[in-house]
């Protein structure tokens, strides 16, 4: 009886679970869970270009099954939604579960009166190294952008560049300031042209120009966005070894995991993969066969804190480090949670950081700080992020889609 009484006293009953879709420049899906004590938790469920599917999954299926549950029982709730649906994994399901998990960790940390990273086991480092994005229509423009970010103090810098003879430049911002937004508003995605031959010929010239001008002081990163075949990626990785890249990201579509063996046979350029992954099962082979160096899974798409902890712990056995996806199509709620996770996780590598527009940060008041290339979550209890519902309501959902790519002959390709 005494044990039952103790359990009941520690029970933190969920009384409300609400879903908000707001577009302060771009669409975000936010879950807010409230307990009977009035403690609230926030979770991010944003899935770029498929936001309403996740919002419906939460609103129609998960939220009703949260009411009356004990918010402390995070693991049980995670398993209930993962196993209980019967249909497992996939981006919509896992983004919804991720938001629930994030919100429950926010609540638990607030109830404990601790910032989340303390609850996870405390800080493993003083700050979180983040990498920024730089690009330009030409090499000169890209070098100018690099210099600007170097002056801001970034220690890790991603470089992209327009390729002569191609109309569109991957990585060019449509948003204001640091808020990069590749999605185009409207009912139809933008179609972009891609030429692997032009890319392979030109891109090493960019890295050469960067290293010649700025030296090797910063970590240099590059995203290939799934566009090369395995043998092309092997050739490319080998050709850029002298530039000592921190990583080449998504060199080829990762569904065919065996093909990374071919890339590994030919190059020691480090490889980062996983932003489109949704569970540890997507990562398992690449990690245990040492086919990658950084795992790019993110809290919003891979099962929240609970899912990401499993992935990171497994990766640590093989000295694979985290390099979480973090563009501005994940909301500030995810960024806040990621910084707590990054402060704690022993096998941390780097965190992607793109910044947000003022509009976005007004809707999501935050507590993190950036100082000379490193970020910190702050020490407020929970995630240290808030959500202004009234302001969010002024920015209703607007259809927007990521681009698609076609080869010069019209064949649909990987964007």
UniProtKB/Swiss-Prot annotation:
Residues binding substrate: 48, 133, 275, 296, 325, 329, 352
UniProt key word tRNA-binding: no
Catalyzed reactions: D-mannonate = 2-dehydro-3-deoxy-D-gluconate + H2O
Binding site for Mg(2+): 223, 249, 275
Cofactor-binding details, from the entry: Binds 1 Mg(2+) ion per subunit.
Keyword terms: Lyase, Magnesium, Metal-binding
EC number, as in UniProt: 4.2.1.-, 4.2.1.8
Highest taxon of source: Bacteria
Residues under site feature: Important for activity and substrate specificity: 327
Active site residues according to the UniProt entry: 170, 225
GO molecular function: magnesium ion binding; mannonate dehydratase activity
Family designation: Belongs to the mandelate racemase/muconate lactonizing enzyme family. GalD subfamily.
Function per UniProt: Has low D-mannonate dehydratase activity (in vitro), suggesting that this is not a physiological substrate and that it has no significant role in D-mannonate degradation in vivo. Has no detectable activity with a panel of 70 other acid sugars (in vitro).
PANTHER family xref list: D-GALACTONATE DEHYDRATASE-RELATED (PTHR48080), STARVATION-SENSING PROTEIN RSPA (PTHR48080:SF6)
Protein name: D-galactonate dehydratase family member RspA
UniProt source species: Escherichia coli (strain MS 21-1)
